[in-house]
Swiss-Prot record:
Domain of life: Eukaryota
Originating gene: SBT4.1
Residue ranges of every copy of the Peptidase S8 domain listed in the record: 110-606
Positions of the Inhibitor I9 domain: 29-105
Keyword Hydrolase: yes
PTM comment: The C-terminal propeptide is autocleaved.
Residues cleaved off as propeptide: 24-106
PA domain boundaries: 365-459
SUPFAM superfamilies named among the record's database cross-references: Subtilisin-like (SSF52743)
Lineage: Eukaryota, Viridiplantae, Streptophyta, Embryophyta, Tracheophyta
Name of protein: Subtilisin-like protease SBT4.1
Length: 775
């Protein structure tokens, strides 16, 4: 009897422990969006009161409550069980309860390439009063790039966690997933353990450092776009180990919102945001709404467009596409890394551009050993891993040491053991499983080169030409060389493209602008190995590193915007307009959905002539005209004064934007007419006359474009003029076809009468080819 009772008691205890564990495991982080007005739960204490009313019996506020937001979001974040979430969703005060998403991070001649050289005129006193908010993976504060002699801006309150603020880093706070269960790879501090945040911050505002470089490559002076500006760090991305054992970066949406909350309260001058999520509808994109609140407070946001284009194949992938955000695509620089594989007896080497080899292989040629598959041999070999018919071998005979080894492979991480075994050798790589392009640079801790399928074939032809003798090869150290004469900026294949699938944003051209994002050398934490993800056996450390992506393009745009702000105390939209309308033309004429207005160019950015001003209320009116829900809009922006019910719905509503874009309906052979209304502001003293010019590319893409009036006359600074652009045509089958949409495009340029100023705006009319185009 006693045994049975003890068994029952044990089972009962196990049941309660299991129930408790299950309840904890079922908790997930949610964002609770509140309605505005009409209830008592609007404050932080009100949020906690509401949450306390719906908690399960065995839960406490300490278990559930995470953040209350003031500036960026109307509501709070909490760790909820499914039942608690359901209770909250039924409350009349609550608008929406949604999962906090995990967003993704998007990676010294680049400033010279944009014509912002060391000799460029600067305003150091004003520049040193500017603060950039870098919302990223933290910072390595001990880098020489992050020193400064000038004090923080007047009235600025230094807020630094775990580190001591200095005259360059004037803020450093961290926001980590408080309720999510992860195995942490790093300590909960602002110190950067991935290198991403350090790299980004140094591109924007790193101070001048002589003799910077990367193992002898691209040596020169490293500096940010605004080397005198201050940096406020808001760490939202962390390295963790997930349940499947994989190490990954976690950038939770609730933490990002809290970082934006604090950045707005701190009154920073600009936000640099190199994170994002492949296309998110505006109604669900809470981070974008937080950036609208930042704009209301005079803060421009520069954000990465995303790295989701898959070698230029995927459109409809642009991230951070709200019109109040400056969305930045990644471009190639005017110099390129070239690596040669020299084959003995051959006149021409094999040349690749997707490898960085930092090792000298002296002057000697080395035997080329084919290890595509286990050869029939008595030598002992161990098969490390095999995937889809590709293999990697180790435990080679000593006599094989120092030979070039040719591997076909399916996954880079399979190379780790091979690299460890042959740390003095060289590896030649090739395979069908990787579709590499100029956007990704492979590098390993031994002499190495990557060959794509075509160039691998050339090596095979050489290898098999005469098998009676040993084949010899030599990998040269990578060199940085200028591109061919006449080269103009090109969009990187990884950079995400428009158009925007969201019906509320269909008539906004995104990205806005392109900036250097490929092979960018910038600051790096000395405690972080150069290849933070792969291979596992790379333990090299440097003060600088090479990274690629829209993450690197974004801080270039941030830096140029701050540079302009150091001279002009303009509104966020005026600064954005100046960057867009003074940009340089790019190649791929019909691909504005890849690069927007063009490529950043500092030459004329301080004197754009005219700017397109778009104020906070303009965005509200625009969304109301498109039929946005009043209650949701009030909650998104945190104001009960908005009332869209009195606004007449107009699905052709226009925004005073520096670009002119419209989606016109199919079917084909249907006439269309689109009218754009624009207002420009004169930003110069004196009298000026601007003449309109339509820049057709080849055959005229439209039946007719009428600009009324054809000239604009200004007599004073700040004067505004309004004009209309009427575009008519027929949606024909011979339009340029780009994946799932068809487009026609041209440019409107307002040219000052003496030719000294040009204000360029692209005109893009497009149709999507079917309902699945945006899926």
């Amino acid at each position: 009897m006693a045994i049975a009772f003890h068994t029952f008691l044990l089972q009962l205890l196990l049941f309660f422990f299991a129930s408790f564990a299950e309840a904890n495991d079922s908790r997930k982080t949610y964002l609770v969006q509140m309605k505005v007005g009409g209830h008592r739960y609007g404050s932080s204490s009100g949020h906690q009161e509401l949450l306390g009313e719906v908690l399960d019996d065995d839960s406490t506020l300490a278990d559930a409550f995470i953040y209350s937001y003031k500036e960026s979001f109307t509501g709070f974040s909490a760790s909820l069980t499914p039942r608690e979430r359901q209770k909250l969703m039924r409350r009349r005060e609550v608008l929406e309860v949604s999962r906090s998403r995990n967003l993704k991070l998007q990676t010294t001649r680049s400033w010279d390439f944009m014509n912002l050289t060391l000799k460029a005129e600067r305003n150091p006193e004003n520049e040193s009063d500017l603060v950039v908010a870098v919302i990223d993976s933290g910072i390595w504060p001990y880098s020489e790039l992050f020193g400064s002699d000038s004090p923080p801006p007047p009235g600025w309150e230094n807020k630094c966690e775990n580190i001591t603020c200095n005259n360059k880093i004037v803020g450093a706070r961290s926001y980590y997933p408080k309720k999510e269960k992860y195995k942490w790879v790093e300590e909960k501090s602002v110190i950067d353990v991935t290198g991403h945040g350090t790299h980004v911050a140094s591109i924007v505002a790193g101070r001048k450092v002589e003799k910077a470089g990367y193992f002898g490559l691209a040596e020169g002076t490293m500096r940010g776009g605004v080397p005198n500006a201050k940096i406020a760090v808001y760490k939202t991305c962390w390295r963790v180990i997930r349940k499947n054992g994989r190490e990954d970066s976690v950038c939770r949406e609730d933490n990002i919102l809290k970082a934006i909350d604090d950045a707005i309260a701190d009154k920073v001058d600009i936000i640099s945001y190199s994170q994002g999520f492949q296309f998110t509808p505006l109604q669900k994109d809470k981070v974008s709404w937080a950036f609208l609140r930042a704009l209301k407070n005079g803060i421009l946001t520069s954000a990465a467009a995303g790295n989701y284009a898959n070698n230029g194949k995927f459109y409809y992938t642009v991230a951070n596409g709200a019109p109040w955000v400056m969305t930045v695509a990644a471009s190639l620089k005017d110099r390129i890394f070239e690596t040669k594989l020299e084959l003995e007896g051959e006149d021409k080497p094999i040349i690749v551009y997707d490898t960085i080899n930092t090792f000298e292989t002296q002057d000697s040629f080395y035997p080329l050993l084919n290890e595509k598959a286990p050869p029939e041999s008595t030598r002992k070999r161990e098969l490390i891993a095999e995937r889809n018919g590709y293999s990697i071998l180790s435990n080679y005979d000593e006599k094989d040491k120092g030979k070039d080894v040719f591997f076909e492979f399916a996954q880079i991480n399979l190379l780790d053991e091979a690299i460890k075994e042959r740390e003095k050798g060289a590896i030649v790589l090739g395979g069908k499983s990787y579709d590499f392009n100029e956007s990704i640079k492979l590098q390993f801790p031994i002499a190495s080169i990557f060959l794509d399928e075509q160039k691998k074939g050339k090596l095979w032809d050489y290898y098999k030409k005469d098998q009676s003798k040993e084949r010899l090869a030599k990998i040269h150290k990578t060199e940085e060389i200028p591109r061919e004469e006449g080269w103009v900026p090109t969009v990187a294949h990884l950079s995400s493209r428009g158009p925007n699938c969201d019906s509320f944003l269909a008539n906004i051209l995104k990205p806005d602008i392109a900036a250097p994002g490929l092979d960018i050398i910038a600051g790096w934490p000395e405690n972080v190995k150069l290849s933070s993800d792969r291979p596992a056996n790379d333990y090299r450390h440097l003060r600088f590193n090479i990274m690629s992506g829209t993450s690197m393009a974004c801080p270039h745009a941030t830096g140029l915007a701050l540079y302009l702000k150091s001279f002009k105390r303009w509104s966020p939209s005026a600064i954005k307009s100046a960057l867009m309308t003074t940009s340089s033309e790019m190649t791929d004429d019909d691909n504005e959905f890849a690069y927007g207005s063009g490529h950043l160019n500092a030459t004329k950015v301080r004197d754009p002539g005219l700017v397109y001003e778009t104020h906070y209320q303009d965005y509200i009116d625009y969304l109301c005209k498109l039929g946005y829900n009043t209650e949701k809009l009030r909650s998104h922006v945190g104001s009960d004064k908005i009332d869209c019910s009195k606004t007449e719905i107009d699905h052709d509503a226009d925004l005073n934007y520096p670009t002119m874009t419209a989606r016109v309906p199919l079917p084909l052979d249907t006439p269309f007419k689109k009218v754009f209304h624009r207002t420009v502001t004169n930003v110069n003293d004196g009298e000026f006359t601007y003449l309109r010019e339509i820049n057709y590319r080849g055959d005229k893409d439209f039946d007719e474009i009428i600009v009324d009036p054809p000239q604009l006359k200004f007599s004073e600074l700040g004067e505004t003029k309004t004009f209309t652009v009427t575009v008519t045509g027929i949606s024909k089958r011979n339009w340029n076809k780009n994946r799932a949409f068809m487009t026609r495009n041209t440019w409107l340029t307002w040219t000052e009468k003496d030719g000294s100023r040009q204000v360029r705006s692209p005109i893009v009319i497009y149709s999507i080819k079917g309902p699945k185009a945006c899926m």
